[in-house]
Amino acid sequence: MLLNSTRTLLLTYGRLLFAPGREGRQSRLAKGVSAWTVAAEGEKGGQLSPAPESTSCCGAAEVNEIKERDTKTCRQASSAGHNDLGLQEKEKSSGDESAFSSLGLNEEKRRALTLVLDGAPLFIGGGAGVGKSYMIQSIVTALRAKDLDVVVTASTGIAALNIGGSTFHSTFGVRVTSVGNSETNESCAVSILRYSKSLLAKVDVIVVDEVSLLHARHLEGLDIAARGAPGRIPHLPFGGIQVILCGDFMQLMHSTENCTSQDGGGDAGNKIGYRGDETTENTAGQNRSDVSSTAAVTDQGHIMSAVKNICVGERQRTSSGLIFESPLFLTCLLHLQLCEVKRHGDTAFLNDLNKLRQGVLTRRMMRSALVNPEDPNAIQLYPTRRSVAAFNESKMLELDGEEHLFRSIVESAGLSGPKGHASPNSRGANNVDGCNDVVVLHFLEKMRSSRRWQREVKKFVGQICTRCGISGIATSVVAPPYSSRQPYLKVYVHFCVSKQYDCLYPVAKMKAEWERSYYGTTPESKSARRFFGRVLFEVKHKNSLSTFLRASLKQAYSKVIESDNVLQSKRLKVGCRVILLRNLSNEYVNGSTGTVIGFQPVNKSRHLFPKGIRTQLSRKVYASLSRRPVVSSDSSAGSSENSYGGNGKEQALDVVNYDDVIVPIVRMDADGKDVAIPWLSLPLPDLQDRVFCTARVVTMPLVPAYAFTVHKTQGLTLDHSILLDCKGFFPCNHIIYVAASRVKKFSQLRMINVSPRMVTVHPGALHFSSSLPNVAEAETKWKKWKELQRMVNNGKALSASNPSVLELALYCATWKHHK
């Protein structure tokens, strides 16, 4: 009933759903690359098939059935013939053929590449060792050869380094959020919308590797931001940008427990543009009934609303944070899997890995520590960062070289401006500035530790600021969790004002409004005094607070800093292996490794800083690392625009000649060059909307690299022997498979403290991965989509009996319009 009625609905507006891509992109796709088109996943008329929500391992019968299906699919892929579509037609240029031969791709990957060059948005799946990373590199090379603007990203730093890109979060400006509680979960959902729209406005293709480690909201937030970027097509998925995703959901996936509840609904979803009505499983069924009852409706608005209700109902019933359960991922990408394994030349080892992938640990794999010889230089893999840190520390104790402690410090950069307005320290704004005066309200009868009173006080003070009624003035009201001698609650009010106002003007207006609203004779004023008690109104200059703020921040967040792998103080020795934790330049990024060969002062090693460095510190910050006082008062020397990289702007280092500001010299593995690693200023986590000033931590972005977490190695092929110690393993699907599949031969693998009960498989991921079509099936589906597109563009009528008509809804992205 639902299938037939929805087909009738979609026939009435199918012509409206097809639209050409950007003209600029079309002009550069003259060699057979078509306009943007979206493709569908699913074999049964485009219906969504949400994966089961169980987290236990699959049963033996289901595993055997899926295993047989996988074997059959791969055999079909190896024997299937070409389909005559896209760039596989006779009109394919000789330039493309020469490009294919130069890339050294096998037949399967060449056919996948033709789909990409034909404009298909793709998800490329496949097991470990099939060459997904090399496939991504080949795709990027071919697209850039056609003068397309391609952005290459990955979910982790090491995976990004492996494909020559950057992390997804750093590329699009998405804040990495630790979501351990409901408050942070809400801010995580909001932050997803903060994508770089300037980048989205000009890019042609976005490539994301290791997509399984991203939350579904990252992909959906990218879609919302791209459709709202300047010059984009709002009604097309991703605004018309071709998106290529790559990954394996049978490897490590995003941790759903930390980012979203099992039902997936609630306020967090509404924050990023979902429907405001709270559709439950019952109301989702009601929405389907509504669609059936309105089958004869021809009004476009009602039709679009009906389709949106279907998609939203599915989303709220199946959302768990996993990308393969997102309707956007299921409906707006053409899916395929690569089957030909390239990494592992050991056939017996490959068979063991395939069984491990499906949840079966063979006896040969269990005895790997006994069968294979011990390698003292083997890379250690652990499940937790704590175990990695302990092993790295033990290796450091074995070294006899010079040792140096790089102690992290907290830096209070200044007062934080209200959301959407310039920071007080940001002088780039033309008509907005921050006041030097700050209003401090001391609620002497309310305790600072009470979250309830913090909310009530901030709400009350915010209402008073609103009643001031001054246009062009924005306020920032915060109750920071600073430690101090006074246990009572303090609220800070800071103003960002237009240039036409004096900074004292809003302070005077607020004081007058405070006197009237709090100390007046009205019933509301009397009620406020009874409710909040004694309050002291005080005005302070921001500079007088800097010392207190820095000390309070360090005390309040010392545990956070020392428990953070990046922000904590580092102890390094000459001769120790290290890994870079942040992007410094195009050559040296998060995940780059090397060996410490010495320590030098800043003034003697500036020529060793990376060229074109992305991040830099001001003179003032480098002076704070020294025990000597600041000599120069030239404010221009502290500009954040100064660079270490030889661009002619070295004033920041010219005025810092302190011998006790030390940096490590690292011989990088990538090119063998000696590089001075600079100090970095990184944001203090969990401070958004909770603090009075912008606070950062100045730290050294290096850690010892004798051991890694399994998560860090996903996407890599290791040439060294590895030792996987499973002691202290936490429940994590696919983690044993990811670790074991990093090497090419069984002789390179040793596993200890492992048992069969540690090998678990996510049923939904197994179901999705086993149902992925091979390249031949993807080609057939893409050809069908192109034929449907031509029919609609030519004004031809589509028959309701056509099973592909329902899939026309997959061209429409209006179900996620941001309101």
Swiss-Prot record:
Cofactor(s) the record lists:
Mg(2+)
Q: What is this protein called?
A: ATP-dependent DNA helicase PIF4
Q: What is its EC number?
A: 5.6.2.3
Gene3D superfamilies on file: P-loop containing nucleotide triphosphate hydrolases
Q: Where in the cell is it found?
A: Mitochondrion matrix, Kinetoplast
**Which species does this protein come from?**
Trypanosoma brucei brucei (strain 927/4 GUTat10.1)
| Purpose of the protein | DNA-dependent ATPase and 5'-3' DNA helicase required for the maintenance of mitochondrial (kinetoplast) genome stability.
Q: Which InterPro entries match?
A: DNA_helicase_pif1-like_DEAD, P-loop_NTPase, PIF1_helicase
Q: How does it assemble?
A: Monomer.
What family does this belong to? Answer: Belongs to the helicase family. PIF1 subfamily.
Q: Where along this sequence does the record place binding of ATP?
A: G126, G127, A128, G129, V130, G131, K132, S133
Would you tell me the Gene Ontology cellular component terms? Answer: cytoplasm; kinetoplast; mitochondrion; nuclear lumen
Keyword S-adenosyl-L-methionine on entry? no
**A Pfam family per the record:** PIF1
Q: What class of enzyme is it?
A: isomerase
Q: MF terms per GO, please?
A: 5'-3' DNA helicase activity; ATP binding; ATP hydrolysis activity; DNA binding; magnesium ion binding
